Amino acid sequence: MSHSVKIYNTCIGCTQCVRACPTDVLEMVPWDGCKAGQIASSPRTEDCVGCKRCESACPTDFLSVRVYLGSETSRSMGLAY
């Protein structure tokens, strides 16, 4: 099963989500669209276990984790949309 971490434009670049991830799915990348100049990205979504520690660590409720079941069906696991 694949998990995808959805990233939105309210990231403050604090890196708390990156540090909270037990499988190192997240990393910070340059991003001009936020004040911090960097944003959390999830290049290794296949390693995500859906624990939502990144969501819990995020001070701005910025992240959303979704579980994709098959090609078109999804079940939301996130808090922020």
UniProtKB/Swiss-Prot annotation:
Say where the protein is mainly found. Answer: plastid
Where is this protein localized, as stated in its record?
A: Plastid, Chloroplast thylakoid membrane
Query: Its catalytic activity?
Result: reduced [plastocyanin] + hnu + oxidized [2Fe-2S]-[ferredoxin] = oxidized [plastocyanin] + reduced [2Fe-2S]-[ferredoxin]
In which domain of life is the source organism classified?
Eukaryota
Identify the keywords attached in UniProt to this record, alphabetized.
4Fe-4S, Chloroplast, Electron transport, Iron, Iron-sulfur, Membrane, Metal-binding, Oxidoreductase, Photosynthesis, Photosystem I, Plastid, Repeat, Thylakoid, Transport
GO MF assignments: 4 iron, 4 sulfur cluster binding; electron transfer activity; metal ion binding; oxidoreductase activity
Write the Enzyme Commission number(s) for this entry.
1.97.1.12
Give the record's membrane topology.
Peripheral membrane protein
Pfam families associated with the record: Fer4_7 (PF12838)
Enumerate the residues binding [4Fe-4S] cluster 2: C21, C48, C51, C54
Q: What's this protein's name?
A: Photosystem I iron-sulfur center
Species name for this entry?
A: Euglena gracilis
